[in-house]
Amino acid sequence: MSDPQNDLIQSCFQSEVSRRTFFDHLLKFGVGGAVAALLPQSAFALPPPPRQDNWRNCRKCSALFFNGYRKGRCPARGAHSGDERNYKLTYNSPGPGQRNWRFCNKCDALFFNGYQNKGVCAAGGSHFAQGFDFTLRYDNRAYGESDWRFCNKCEVIFFNRDSNAGMCAAGAGHVAAGLRFVLDDSVRID
């Protein structure tokens, strides 16, 4: 029986490939493999997922809303009123966190689109999803501001650190349920 490796090496020497070319290629591939093995894995990492800023906490209802072009409908009457923090949300990301958070085209709040019932919208009826699919982190060790919660009545995300849980579109105050989310508030607007 013949050895396949020896046959390959012998065929390389018997073909038009010279011994010098063979060792030259062997050296190039060997060095390339060694370099690839020594590089940190981050050298091959994907670029960070895209993020959208201009998300604000409403001073009146405590919900997170998009402040990019209009103020939306607030359940505490009128339009949302943003505070000084500018939150950046990751979208279209396979990374860690909970997906299915969407912008409501009617009230401009961020709501969870993972249930068949789309929650109660301050602009009437249910929320209407549009735009990006946002991913929210919920690890307490993650960088950012914690104590953001899902309201199980209206299905928006709201800030739950203060004793005031904010005004809910489904009536009275928000009711926190599930995970404690962490939002990136590294960009401040003063």
State each model region's role.
Residues 68-71, 83-85, 114-117, 131-132, ...:
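Short Cys/His-rich "knuckle" micro-motifs
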Residues 1-21:
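N-terminal secretory signal peptides
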Residues 55, 71, 101, 118, ...:
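Residues immediately within or flanking Cys/His clusters that coordinate Zn2+
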Residues 16, 37-63:
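C-terminal segment of N-terminal export signals and the immediately downstream linker at the start
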Residues 58, 74, 104, 121, ...:
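Short cysteine-rich clusters marking metal-coordination/redox-active sites
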Residues 61, 77, 107, 124, ...:
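Short Cys/His-rich metal-coordination motifs, predominantly Zn2+-binding knuckles/fingers
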Residues 18-31:
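N-terminal export leaders
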Residues 65, 78-81, 111, 125, ...:
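Cys/His-rich microdomains that often coordinate metals
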